[in-house]
Amino acid sequence: MSTAGKVIKCKAAVLWEPHKPFTIEDIEVAPPKAHEVRIKMVATGVCRSDDHAVSGSLFTPLPAVLGHEGAGIVESIGEGVTCVKPGDKVIPLFSPQCGKCRICKHPESNLCCQTKNLTQPKGALLDGTSRFSCRGKPIHHFISTSTFSQYTVVDDIAVAKIDAAAPLDKVCLIGCGFSTGYGSAVQVAKVTPGSTCAVFGLGGVGLSVVIGCKTAGAAKIIAVDINKDKFAKAKELGATDCINPQDYTKPIQEVLQEMTDGGVDFSFEVIGRLDTMTSALLSCHSACGVSVIVGVPPSAQSLSVNPMSLLLGRTWKGAIFGGFKSKDAVPKLVADFMAKKFPLEPLITHVLPFEKINEAFDLLRAGKSIRTVLTF
């Protein structure tokens, strides 16, 4: 029996308050309005940014259905939707691409002017309303996606059709973590063959930076982390050296400068700490180095830096979603994965049923997982 045009009752993980566990609730998901798409979720990754929302360091209105790194199948579409049809495999996009605004038309940027849910989260779709309700009350959306639900509704500028043969429990990582890291290397920094790179932080995103540096042909990839247990995986994915700052008495940037004849060509901060952002900047060569901020810093914090750190020729950059224009890039990234141009499987350390979402967050907080994928 078709569910198109009808309210769907399903299970979702609802966060009612900050610092509290998710609760699995019976919710109602309204049909998509014009230019909206309702998706039956198949798999979703658990990302550190979701945990930032739980802790309150990343503001989002509550109660909400979180999750932003998922993949699923289109259940129904609203009036005017032409980019997907029911039955298509898709990835929701937390960084939309309208294709019409000034930024979408700019060749060097990817932050669509409709990305208000990232910069000024309202917890709603573009029309300002929610499609979720629970116990008779509206439930907020989360950055255009809300993948912690058996069904979700997104705007049609926030969804990408992908290869019908793609394994959704793998390519869901392309919805955030992998693309953010990989793109920071190949799209934002534009790592060059034979170059030297330093990657600060070896979580799922940091390891994806390592994959990007290797794919781009870097000759030396130095992985930096205080957890030595992460070094084996980093080397498996392409790191040539692994160092722990706690093993040295001098600042880590000085260690890296000595290892690389004055500094690396490219450095990446994938932790979200202000002190390591400065260390990453100073670890790249003062005359030609490029440093990329990848990690999301805590809200309402600012960074001070000596202008001389930049005046001689360093470049300091940052980007959301690896600098990729989402609707254009996601199908290509999925195709590249299918063509075995890069791996995703080594990033997935745990696969759990959706109902065990709180266990997945426990693994994340304990540093015991790289990526946990929840399946519906």
From Swiss-Prot:
EC number: 1.1.1.1
GO terms, biological process: animal organ regeneration; behavioral response to ethanol; ethanol catabolic process; lipid metabolic process; response to ethanol; response to progesterone; response to retinoic acid; response to steroid hormone
Residues recorded as bearing N-acetylserine in the entry: S2
Keywords from the UniProt entry: Acetylation, Cytoplasm, Metal-binding, NAD, Oxidoreductase, Zinc
One Pfam family in the UniProt entry: ADH_zinc_N
UniProt-annotated binding residues for NAD(+): G201, L202, G203, G204, V205, G206, D225, K230, V294, G295, V296, R371
Enzyme class, broadest EC rank: oxidoreductase
Residues engaged in binding Zn(2+) 1: C47, H68, C176
Gene3D superfamilies in alphabetical order: Medium-chain alcohol dehydrogenases, catalytic domain (3.90.180.10), NAD(P)-binding Rossmann-like Domain (3.40.50.720)
GO CC annotation terms, alphabetical: cytosol; mitochondrion
GO molecular function, one term: identical protein binding
SMART domains, per the entry: PKS_ER (SM00829)
InterPro entries attached to this UniProt entry: ADH-like_C (IPR013149), ADH-like_N (IPR013154), ADH_Zn_CS (IPR002328), GroES-like_sf (IPR011032), NAD(P)-bd_dom_sf (IPR036291), PKS_ER (IPR020843)
Keyword ATP-binding: no
Positions of post-translational N6-succinyllysine modification: K235, K341
Top-rank taxon, per record: Eukaryota
Summary of subunit composition and partner proteins: Dimer of identical or non-identical chains of three types (A, B, C), which are coded by 3 separate genes at different loci.
Family: Belongs to the zinc-containing alcohol dehydrogenase family. Class-I subfamily.
Protein name (Swiss-Prot/TrEMBL): Alcohol dehydrogenase 1
Organism field: Rattus norvegicus (Rat)
Gene: Adh1
